[in-house]
Amino acid sequence: MAKKPSIELPPFEIPAGYALIAGVDEVGRGPLVGDVVTAAVILDPNRPIMGLNDSKKLSEKKRLALFPEIQVKALAWAVGRCSPQEIDELNIFQATMVAMQRAVAGLRIQPDLVLIDGNKIPKLPMEAQAVVKGDLRVAQISAASIIAKVIRDQEMEALDKQYPQFGFAKHKGYPTAAHFAAIEQHGVIEQHRKSFGPVKRALGIE
C-alpha cells in the first residue's frame, strides 16, 4: 500500500509586537496511568538552542541532552500537571486545560503571548493562540514538549521501580498489549485512571 504523503505545514509566523512568548505543550493524555504533564517555556532569543523539535520525533538521548540546556538557557520554564484523580473528576480534556493553566501560572515571568500546541486553548489572563502541529513549527512549543516528555518519562521510570510487574519504564503507561496483560494479571494501582475504559473494565465498573 502506498504511503500517504506527509503534509508540509507552513512555518508559523509569530505575531509581531510581543516581547515575551511562551510555548505550551502536554504529554500524557493517552496513558492509562499517571499525571497528564504540561510545560510552559519562554526562550531567550539571545541564547538559541539548536535541534529543537517535537519531543516524540527526537531520540531519548537527544531529549535528555536538550532537557538541561532548555532549563539553563530559557528565560523561564514551569511544569503543570493534573493527577489521575483530577483526570477522573474532570475528564482528560479539561484536566489538560487545567494543567496548562498551572504551567503558565508557574512561570516566574509573565508572558505577553502564549502559543499552545493543538487547536484548543485554556482560559488565560493573557493573549493565547493555538498552533496546529506547533511542536514542529514553534521553538517555544518544541522546548515545552521536551520538558514535559522528559519529566513524565522520569516519573514513569520511578513508578516502574515501585511496581516492576507493570513495565511502566517501557510503555510509559500507554495502552499497550503488555500493559493490558499486566492489568489482567495484577489488577490496577492507585495511579491508574479509573475513568479510562480499560481500567474501568478491569475494575468491573463498565
Curated annotation (Swiss-Prot):
GO terms for biological process: DNA replication, removal of RNA primer; mismatch repair. Manganese or magnesium. Binds 1 divalent metal ion per monomer in the absence of substrate. May bind a second metal ion after substrate binding. A divalent metal cation binds at residues 25-26, 117. Its main location: cytoplasm. One of its GO terms (cellular component) is cytoplasm. Residues 19-206 form the RNase H type-2 domain. Its EC number is 3.1.26.4. Gene3D superfamilies: Ribonuclease H-like superfamily/Ribonuclease H (3.30.420.10). InterPro entries: RNase_HII (IPR022898), RNase_HII/HIII (IPR001352), RNase_HII/HIII_dom (IPR024567), RNaseH-like_sf (IPR012337), RNaseH_sf (IPR036397). It comes from the Bacteria. It catalyses: Endonucleolytic cleavage to 5'-phosphomonoester. Its cofactor is Mn(2+); Mg(2+). SUPFAM superfamilies: Ribonuclease H-like (SSF53098). It is found in: Cytoplasm. NCBIfam families: PRK00015.1-1, PRK00015.1-3, PRK00015.1-4. Endonuclease that specifically degrades the RNA of RNA-DNA hybrids. Belongs to the RNase HII family. This is Ribonuclease HII. It comes from Vibrio cholerae serotype O1 (strain ATCC 39315 / El Tor Inaba N16961).
